[in-house]
Amino acid sequence: MTASVETRPDLATRADIHDLVVAFYREVVFDDVLAPVFTEVAETDWSTHIPRLIDYWCRVLLGQPGSTGALLASHRHVHAIEPLRPEHFDRWVALWFASIDERWAGPTSEQAKAHAIRVGSVIAGRLGGCPWAGPAATRVGGQR
């Protein structure tokens, strides 16, 4: 059960980011839409992927030093094998938002959501053939 906004802390520490990333990927690995992309197509090595994403989000949200990694290159590789579709990006954002909202609320939490939309938009735009117009929930009438 999600705590009320008034009782949820904001994302503030590396431990918070760790917990968020782990909670998010726990959902991803069992998700009907995303699990096949991560496990069958990308063959994700979770032992390296999780720490890399923790570093990435700590850099973005907390200003901690760290590498940005090759976000676009890895997504291009996956897209070449099995094209990513708007529903992949919609689901990714929905799970990310839900993972945040389950435990955190505040300016940094909102920044994490906004940044995820920007990342998704940039990646989808640069992949070609993936006309993602942002999360379905934010589009008027759910139109693409």
Locate each region found by the language model.
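Core of compact, soluble alpha-helical bundle domains
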Residues: 1-144
